[in-house]
Structure formats: structure tokens, C-alpha cells
């Protein structure tokens, strides 16, 4: 087997593990079967989930067999948060999310060959258990004292309190490991470091019930340079679903990675070899303005999630927006996603003066300021220099019949979207 342990260590993907020597030996002598779980708490995964998805992919590439669990049962309960109780979602909604998340994860893995991946749903074994079976076969092996010591539980007890439903979540997740060990020979659980308590509880349940030693590996929770949570922008989470976060916005998120963190992100999210990442790291130090590391990161992750064609298209769109190529060549869906990230005016008709639109979108401080920018030669509409301060939107060849890109100078952008006819 490939020495995937050293690779995971170098990439900074090991925050915690059970007995390191035993796990390393199991990985080297494998193949072993491992699982990673995702709860369907929304219609899409976000970029934070990619750490688990891509780590699962790395293990599969090393010859190990992945089980991908999307929790149709645990998603109905909810892992306790330190702050407040989770919203209980309708079972039909959760079932739809299970299907959606399975579809998002599947393209990252191989479902054929000796290390073929398998999708599993914990509702399959949880819904058939009676309450008596659950309490005797699972609950009997858990100490309430230890459950009360869990950080999320203790914080909730000190503030808003916690329901028995969420308090019992750890039993459900632990039973997943037991069931997957029995049904599929699973001997490794992969998860985020925030799940470490749940993961090790599953290891302990397997040891108590089946008298077998199994393994656990937790990846770190990535952060920004200031220590805040990775994967959030001012507009919210960065989703994998292109309808929730456009491919353009997705690419921009990675392109804006901080210099201090870009190498960490390349290690975690890229499949480039060590030599290439180290070279990109050197370039980031020696010539940070070129942003070569960020460009490499943005292209690769966008291609992984949305496909190579989309990655190339959004890069072409970015170049066109700043005057580097033809705006008319941009696909409408990509253009719409790009313009959604800009200040936008939606005039009721096309008789409005372009100078007014520069003021309305904030590219100029006022109408007089917009006229001054036009007079100085610093105003562009669809990459064509605007020379007439009295020109209206009717004088513009709209992109895809309804869009215009306004630019002041080299970098300040805004958009115009003419409403569709009713």
C-alpha cells in the first residue's frame, strides 16, 4: 500500500488519531475499509466539507475502500451545537437532502474496482431498531457522566439547556460505527476534529460490544489567518451547489485566499505533488503580487467541484470583466454569476443616462462625479470607453440582451441588469 500516512501528515490533515503506530501499520498493510459521515442539514455541502471528501479520496487512491455515510437518521436528530438547539426538519426534506448530498459526493470517488466506494444511509439500520433494542444494545454501554462532560453538552446545560434528542446523538453516531464494522468490516472512521468525541465513542462501543480494536482519524478545522472560521464570506457559506454559490463566486473565494494560508489550503485541497506546492509557496513569498499560488488553488478546486470547463470559463470571465478579452463571448450563466458579485443597478427602462448608472452603483460619488470620470476618459461600458456624458442605456449593445458591465479605471466594476419583460 502507498504510504498515505506520511502524505496526510505532510498535508496537515491529521489533527488527532487513535494509536498512531497501530493506525499507520493498518494503512500500510491494508487495504482497510473506512467511513466518513455527512449529516444532511442543508441542501448542499459547503467548502468546509471538502476536507473530508478529499481526504476520503486520498485514502481511496492509496488503495483503501471508502464507505460514504449520509445520515438519514442522524440528520433527523442533529449533533448538539454549543449555542442552541437545531431546527427539526421534516423527514421528507431530509430524505431529499440525503439524495442531493450523495449526488454531490459521488463524482469525487471511484465506485468500481477493488477499492470501490459504497454509499450507505444510517436510516437503513436505525429505523428498524426498537426503543428497547437501542437502550439495551447501545445505551447500556454509555456513561451519562461522560456524556455530560462533552463540551457542547456542558455549554448548553450552562445556558439554554439541551433536549434528550440532541443529547442522544452520540449514541446514534457510535452505533453507525458498530453497524458498519459488522456489515462491511469497517475499521477506520474519518471526521473533523470537532467530531472527535463522537468518533472515539464509536471506537469504544465497537471495543465493548464486539471486542475489536478499530481506528479513528480526525482532520483539523481550517481557519483564516485571523483564526476565524474557514469557508465563510460576508454573504454566508460557500456552497458546492452552483445554484447557491456560482462557479465564478466559488473561484473568487479561492482566489482571495490570504498569502499566510494559501499553502495550507493547497496542501489540504489540491492533489499537486509536494514539489509543486513547495515551489508555489516560494513564489508566494518572493512575488506575492503575482498570486500564482492563489491562481493555482482557485483553478484546481473549481475544476474538482465544477469541472475543468467551468474553471476555464470563469477565468475567462474574470479576464473579460477587467478588459482583458471579449465580454460577449462569456456564457450567460457564467456572466450572471460574475455580475451577481458586483454592485448592480436594475433600471426600469433603457432611457436612463449611463452617467446616472455610474452614480447609482457607487462607481462615482454623484452624477457630477460620473460626468467628470467620463470626461477624464476613465469610464467604460462593456469594455468600450464612454465619451458622451449624455449617452443612455439605449446606446449600449447589451450582453445577452439585458446586461451591461460598468468599469471605472482598471479595477472598479459594477453591473446593470435590465429586468425581464413581464
UniProtKB/Swiss-Prot annotation:
ATP binds at residue 232. L-tyrosine binds at residues 35, 169, 173. One of its GO terms (biological process) is tyrosyl-tRNA aminoacylation. Residues 352-418 form the S4 RNA-binding domain. Its EC number is 6.1.1.1. It is an enzyme of class 6 (ligase). One of its GO terms (molecular function) is tyrosine-tRNA ligase activity. InterPro entries: aa-tRNA-synth_I_CS, aa-tRNA-synth_Ic, Rossmann-like_a/b/a_fold, S4_RNA-bd_sf, SYY-like_C, Tyr-tRNA-ligase, Tyr-tRNA-ligase_bac-type, Tyr-tRNA-ligase_bac_1. A motif ('KMSKS' region) lies at residues 229-233. One of its GO terms (cellular component) is cytosol. Pfam families: SYY_C-terminal, tRNA-synt_1b. PROSITE patterns: AA_TRNA_LIGASE_I, S4. It comes from the Bacteria. A motif ('HIGH' region) lies at residues 40-49. It is found in: Cytoplasm. Keywords: Aminoacyl-tRNA synthetase, ATP-binding, Cytoplasm, Ligase, Nucleotide-binding, Protein biosynthesis, RNA-binding. It catalyses: tRNA(Tyr) + L-tyrosine + ATP = L-tyrosyl-tRNA(Tyr) + AMP + diphosphate + H(+). The keyword Glycoprotein does not apply. Catalyzes the attachment of tyrosine to tRNA(Tyr) in a two-step reaction: tyrosine is first activated by ATP to form Tyr-AMP and then transferred to the acceptor end of tRNA(Tyr). Belongs to the class-I aminoacyl-tRNA synthetase family. TyrS type 1 subfamily. PANTHER family: TYROSINE--TRNA LIGASE, MITOCHONDRIAL (PTHR11766:SF0), TYROSYL-TRNA SYNTHETASE (PTHR11766). Homodimer. This is Tyrosine--tRNA ligase. The lineage of its organism: Bacteria, Bacillati, Actinomycetota, Actinomycetes, Kineosporiales.
Amino acid at each position: 500500500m502507498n504510504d498515505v500516512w506520511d502524505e496526510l501528515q505532510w498535508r496537515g490533515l491529521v489533527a488527532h488519531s487513535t494509536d498512531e503506530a497501530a493506525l499507520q501499520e493498518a494503512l500500510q498493510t491494508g487495504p482497510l475499509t473506512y467511513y466518513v459521515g455527512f449529516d444532511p442539514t442543508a441542501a448542499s455541502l459547503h467548502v468546509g466539507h471538502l476536507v473530508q471528501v478529499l481526504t476520503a479520496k486520498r485514502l481511496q487512491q492509496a488503495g483503501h475502500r471508502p464507505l460514504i455515510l449520509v445520515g438519514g437518521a442522524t440528520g433527523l436528530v442533529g449533533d448538539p451545537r454549543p449555542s442552541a438547539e437545531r431546527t427539526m426538519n421534516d423527514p421528507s426534506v431530509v430524505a431529499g437532502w440525503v439524495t442531493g448530498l450523495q449526488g454531490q459526493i459521488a463524482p469525487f470517488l471511484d465506485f468500481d474496482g477493488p477499492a470501490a466506494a459504497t454509499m450507505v444511509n444510517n436510516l437503513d439500520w436505525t429505523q428498524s431498531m426498537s426503543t428497547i433494542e437501542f437502550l439495551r444494545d447501545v445505551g447500556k454501554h454509555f456513561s451519562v457522566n461522560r456524556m455530560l462532560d462533552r463540551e457542547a453538552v456542558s455549554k448548553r446545560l450552562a445556558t439554554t439547556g439541551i433536549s434528550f434528542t440532541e443529547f442522544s446523538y452520540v449514541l446514534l453516531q457510535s452505533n453507525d460505527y458498530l453497524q458498519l464494522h459488522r456489515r462491511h468490516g469497517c475499521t477506520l472512521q474519518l471526521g473533523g476534529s470537532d467530531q472527535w468525541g463522537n468518533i472515539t465513542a464509536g471506537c469504544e462501543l465497537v471495543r465493548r460490544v464486539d471486542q475489536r480494536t478499530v481506528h479513528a482519524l480526525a482532520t483539523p478545522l481550517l481557519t483564516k489567518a485571523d483564526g476565524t472560521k474557514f469557508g465563510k464570506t460576508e454573504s454566508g457559506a460557500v456552497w458546492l451547489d452552483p445554484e447557491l454559490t456560482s462557479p465564478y463566486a466559488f473561484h473568487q473565494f479561492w482566489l482571495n485566499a490570504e498569502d499566510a494560508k494559501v499553502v495550507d489550503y493547497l496542501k489540504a485541497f489540491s492533489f499537486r505533488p509536494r514539489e509543486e506546492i513547495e515551489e508555489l509557496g516560494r513564489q508566494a513569498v518572493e512575488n506575492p503580487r503575482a498570486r500564482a499560488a492563489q491562481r493555482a488553488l482557485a483553478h484546481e478546486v473549481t475544476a474538482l467541484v465544477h469541472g475543468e470547463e467551468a474553471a476555464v470559463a470563469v477565468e475567462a470571465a474574470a479576464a473579460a470583466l477587467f478588459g482583458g478579452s471579449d465580454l460577449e463571448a462569456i456564457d450567460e450563466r457564467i456572466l450572471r454569476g460574475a455580475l451577481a458579485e458586483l454592485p448592480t443597478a436594475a433600471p426600469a427602462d433603457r432611457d436612463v443616462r449611463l452617467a446616472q448608472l455610474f452614480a447609482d452603483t457607487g462607481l462615482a460619488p454623484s452624477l457630477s462625479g460620473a460626468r467628470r470620470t467620463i470626461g477624464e476618459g476613465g469610464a467604460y461600458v462593456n469594455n468600450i470607453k464612454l465619451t458622451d456624458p449624455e449617452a443612455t442605456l439605449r446606446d449600449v449593445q447589451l450582453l445577452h440582451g439585458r446586461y451591461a458591465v460598468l468599469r471605472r479605471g482598471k479595477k472598479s466594476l459594477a453591473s446593470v441588469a435590465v429586468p425581464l419583460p413581464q
